[in-house]
Amino acid sequence: MDMILYIPYDFPFVMDEGMSRFISQYVDGNYLEGYTWKMSINGLECTNCQSPEDASKRDLADFNQIEISGKFDLRILRQDHYSVELNGPEHEKEQYTVRRSGETLIIDFNRNKNFDWDVKGLTLEEMKITITMPTIEKIEAVGLGNIRFEDFTSDDLEIEVRGPVKIRGEINAHNLIIKLTGKSEADLSGNTNNLNARIEFASRLRAYHLQAQDAFVEVSGASSAKVNVSGTLEMDEGVASDIDYRGNPQIIRHD
């Protein structure tokens, strides 16, 4: 027996998987139970399904770590909501993949992972990126550019930078871990109970305005660090490297 079902235009209805099989138009199985549909002159339409843009915004939330590569000017703002905005030429945007993996927001430059970011006259255009998030626990950056953040409070924060990237920020953290390599620079202010810094390969840490209770600082490969410590400062200075300090700490030197 053949049967034709007529549905008035703009009349809302719901359907299950069985009903969807009788409809010639493609229906996404993820939008059956709990979703409302209507028939328009353009065909079947879902009235409460998420648009691809809404789904993308939903996916780019609930992160507390950032992993970024490329040539960028990144600003991280403390807000109660999550957002990610890339501003730059479309042909440059196409070279980046933005996604979330667990609690990590990943902004990945799609070219060769062994790209030499220290090449003079690099022709890549800078991507301006703004991220808002409530808290932050880790920043990992590879490439060339600038990172700025301020007014964050964390139990633990890890900053790892590889390549000629300059990072500037204000942070209050119980434990702060810093790893700089490959001509990277960090200028930090705020407060921390425990600072652990490893600076190498012509990198620089400027942290006179970061009040640290205790610190372990290791520099090597023509690198330098300036720190402000009031308790115990453990120092490991390599060849052609230098650690300057303020705060009258107890010094423990490692050979």
Question: Model-predicted segments: where are they?
Answer:
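Acidic (Asp/Glu) and glycine-rich low-complexity loops/linkers
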Residues: 1-13, 19-160, 170-179, 187-196, ...
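Outer-membrane beta-barrel transmembrane domain signature
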Residues: 206-210
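Leucine-rich solenoid repeat scaffolds
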Residues: 233-255
